[in-house]
């Protein structure tokens, strides 16, 4: 396959964006909406809610910790077979879950098997997308990740309708069929060879190189800190509002407000990430700082107007930081190592995601309210912002019209003049 000097910034890349849109919807849209099965599982197996909640927790943990496996397979064989295999595993897990007779079966089928399938789909797809775009990378990421928000609106009522008409076993069969569309998403991931790709060295050599790369390690620490506080409103905002005397329906509706703002923020940030000159890390630091401040202000707001305004602002800024967070990594490690780099980041930052909600709940139990929970969550994001400013070129303003990836492109396009014939002759 011929090597391209730079990403095409379009062409088949838009089909990869389409694939990533549906893939993000079929992975995280399903995960976000899977709570509608929660009550059905509790009633069917007569198990406590705590044990049932482990189904989704295992699936998320396997998806995140298994990301390096998906990255390694994509580096070795390409993203297409990795994602298509992941789609088959996801559908098979949901299919087997429909025959479950105990929670252990659901742990193994949905948690382990479908979780493994999700691990093989999400990271390779976004990494492939990063290789197709350079100057429009942030916009492409923003458009692709809107699939999460849109599917969160659609899947929850859809799954409830399926439960009402086909019971939970029939609904899981149909979710299995829906998940098979991940195979089609994988088929759209056409391999792309770039001049920046490593000539030698497999996934192991790339991982070793990344673990010795200071900026990559600092970026991973920053995202882990951000991830620790990022999801707190989605987990505890409704409970916080109930403590303030809100009814359940308006409290839940506020999350829908955040989801709408999230969609707008992702697209707007994607456009700004490509339009504003300089490293994308600056924009990521801005959105992260604003999100941290908003979280810390939640305990101060008690009036409904203030809470609605804060939630709209949180949805926008938290959605805005997502596409630029994925766009910073190619600037740090290059597109040649993006598969392994993104897999490692996903694995490490999952530690923050797993610890954030339990820590927030612990602070609620100790203090009796969610004041400390939101303040500490905001502090984690502000700490992540502090780490981001240590990244290379963050304070470099000498060439405000060029982005780091543009400098790489210019270097690749530079033509060195060859000596003319007869040079040196008398």
Curated annotation (Swiss-Prot):
GO MF assignments: monocarboxylic acid transmembrane transporter activity; symporter activity
Gene Ontology CC terms, in alphabetical order: Golgi apparatus; Golgi membrane; plasma membrane
Cross-referenced SUPFAM superfamilies: MFS general substrate transporter
Segments on the Cytoplasmic side according to the record's topology features: 1-10, 395-426
PROSITE patterns per UniProt: MFS (PS50850)
Spans through the membrane: 11-31, 52-72, 83-103, 106-126, 139-159, 172-192, 221-241, 244-264, 283-303, 306-326, 338-358, 374-394
Compartments where located: Golgi apparatus membrane; Cell membrane
CDD domains linked to this entry: MFS_MCT11_13
Primary location group: Golgi
InterPro entries: MFS (IPR011701), MFS_dom (IPR020846), MFS_MCT_13 (IPR048233), MFS_trans_sf (IPR036259), Proton-linked_MCT (IPR050327)
Keyword NADP: no
UniProt keyword list: Cell membrane, Golgi apparatus, Membrane, Symport, Transmembrane, Transmembrane helix, Transport
Membrane topology: Multi-pass membrane protein
Pfam families in alphabetical order: MFS_1
Function field: Proton-linked monocarboxylate transporter. May catalyze the transport of monocarboxylates across the plasma membrane.
UniProt similarity note: Belongs to the major facilitator superfamily. Monocarboxylate porter (TC 2.A.1.13) family.
Identification of the protein by name: Monocarboxylate transporter 13
Species this chain originates from: Bos taurus (Bovine)
Lineage: Eukaryota, Metazoa, Chordata, Craniata, Vertebrata
Gene: SLC16A13
């Amino acid at each position: 396959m011929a090597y391209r000097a730079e990403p095409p910034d379009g062409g088949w890349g838009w089909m990869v964006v389409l694939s990533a849109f549906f893939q993000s919807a079929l992975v995280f849209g399903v995960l976000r909406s899977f709570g509608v099965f929660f009550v059905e599982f509790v009633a069917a197996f007569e198990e406590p809610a705590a044990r049932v909640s482990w189904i989704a927790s295992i699936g998320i943990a396997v998806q995140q910790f298994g990301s390096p496996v998906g990255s390694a397979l994509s580096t070795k064989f390409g993203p297409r077979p990795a994602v298509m295999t992941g789609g088959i595993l996801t559908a098979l897990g949901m299919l087997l879950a429909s025959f479950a007779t105990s929670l252990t079966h659901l742990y193994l089928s949905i948690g382990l098997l479908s979780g493994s399938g999700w691990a093989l789909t999400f990271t390779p797809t976004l990494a492939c997308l990063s290789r197709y775009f350079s100057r429009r990378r942030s916009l492409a990421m923003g458009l692709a990740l809107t699939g999460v928000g849109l599917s969160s609106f659609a899947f929850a009522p859809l799954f409830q309708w399926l439960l009402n008409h086909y019971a939970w076993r029939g609904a899981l069969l149909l979710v299995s069929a829906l998940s098979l569309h991940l195979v089609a998403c994988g088929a759209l991931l056409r391999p792309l060879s770039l001049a920046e790709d490593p000539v030698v060295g497999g996934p192991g050599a790339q991982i070793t190189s990344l673990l010795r790369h200071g900026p990559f390690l600092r970026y991973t620490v920053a995202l882990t800190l951000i991830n620790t506080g990022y999801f707190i409103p989605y987990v505890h905002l409704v409970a916080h509002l109930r403590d303030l005397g809100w009814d359940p329906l308006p409290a839940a509706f506020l999350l829908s407000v955040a989801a709408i703002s999230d969609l707008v923020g992702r697209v707007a940030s994607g456009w700004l990430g490509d339009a504003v000159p300089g490293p994308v890390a600056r924009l990521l630091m801005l959105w992260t700082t604003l999100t941290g401040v908003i979280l810390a202000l939640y305990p101060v707001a008690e009036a409904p107007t203030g809470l609605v305004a804060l939630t709209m602002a949180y949805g926008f800024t938290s959605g805005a930081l997502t596409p630029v967070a994925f766009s910073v990594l190619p600037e740090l490690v290059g597109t040649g190592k993006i598969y392994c780099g993104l897999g490692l980041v996903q694995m490490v930052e999952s530690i923050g995601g797993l610890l954030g909600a339990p820590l927030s709940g612990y602070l609620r139990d100790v203090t009796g309210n969610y004041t400390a929970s939101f303040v500490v969550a905001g502090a984690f994001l502000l700490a992540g912002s502090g780490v981001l400013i240590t990244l290379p070129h963050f304070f470099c303003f000498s060439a405000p019209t060029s982005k780091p990836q543009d400098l790489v492109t210019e270097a690749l396009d530079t033509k060195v003049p060859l000596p003319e014939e007869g040079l040196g002759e008398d």
